[in-house]
Regions:
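Helical "lid/coupling" subdomains associated with nucleotide-phosphate turnover
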Residues: 1-253
Length: 253
């Protein structure tokens, strides 16, 4: 489960050694690119397992687009050293998308300064403080992510997104089943977004139902994740590693 997220060839023994070392020195940071990949792969699996366990304890009736997938949370606020120490926001976002596999439309925010534990403690004394911190810019708005649920064949168009900016310009992009697309939207801008599912894809309102909304700018903008839910990684190592590299490149490396 760990090696499937790697783009390099690493022996199981090397991974075990890294895990033992990390257990002994939890505050250590990756010294090489290989170590960084192993640590991020561990982070994906740890978060996936933790979320799976948490879902079993959620109350009945929490809305989901499909059984055993992440409920429709908005917003998703995440923190932790693996996310905050990632060299790029694109890597942080991809870890979250791979591990959580959200569906529908979600805003993903990163606690890059590890403020959440302190704010959680402070909330007992001042319940408004965490809200003020969220609005202060102390957290990084990573992206608005749209993840359609679709059973279409690989390569089929499943979603068309149109962004109308304040200057009147319009950006249009289509995402295919299995694809990952990005529409840049700088922080500070607010645009009108129209999402039109195709071939009965569902983004939260029902199969084929269009959504119109306003979205604000973020570090990575609008991300259209058509890779499928649940995310099914191909078994061929060479093709899988090439695909993961492509996803990283799409999100900025």
């Amino acid at each position: 489960n760990i090696t499937r997220w790697l783009t390099i060839d690493v022996s199981p023994q090397r991974i075990s050694d890294y895990v033992y070392t990390k257990a002994l020195y939890p505050n250590s940071i990756p010294a090489t690119q290989d170590d960084l990949q192993i640590e991020q792969a561990l982070g994906r699996e740890a978060l996936r397992i933790a979320m799976s366990a948490a879902q079993k304890k959620l109350p009945d009736g929490v809305p989901t687009l499909k059984k055993n997938l992440l409920p429709s949370f908005e917003i998703i606020l995440a923190g932790g050293s693996i996310l905050s120490n990632a060299p790029t926001f694109g890597q942080s976002l991809l870890i979250l998308l791979d591990a959580l596999q959200p569906t529908g439309v979600n805003t993903l925010i990163l606690d890059a300064n590890n403020l959440l534990p302190a704010l959680g403690a402070a909330a007992e004394i001042n319940s408004i403080l965490p809200v003020q911190a969220l609005e202060s810019g102390a957290f990084v708005n990573l992206a608005t992510v749209v993840s359609p649920l679709s059973s279409s064949r690989y390569g089929t168009n499943i979603l068309k997104a149109s962004l109308r900016r304040a200057d009147g310009s319009v950006s249009v992009v289509e995402v295919k089943q299995g694809g990952l697309e990005v529409l840049p939207l700088p922080i500070g801008q607010v645009t009108d977004l129209v999402l039109q599912p195709q071939h009965r894809a569902d983004i939260g309102q029902g199969a084929g139902k269009k959504i119109s909304m306003q979205v604000g700018g973020s570090a990575l903008g609008l991300v259209l994740d058509g890779r499928g839910r649940p995310l099914d990684l191909i078994s061929d190592e060479v093709r899988r590693r090439s695909l993961i590299k492509k996803w990283l490149w799409t999100l900025g490396g």
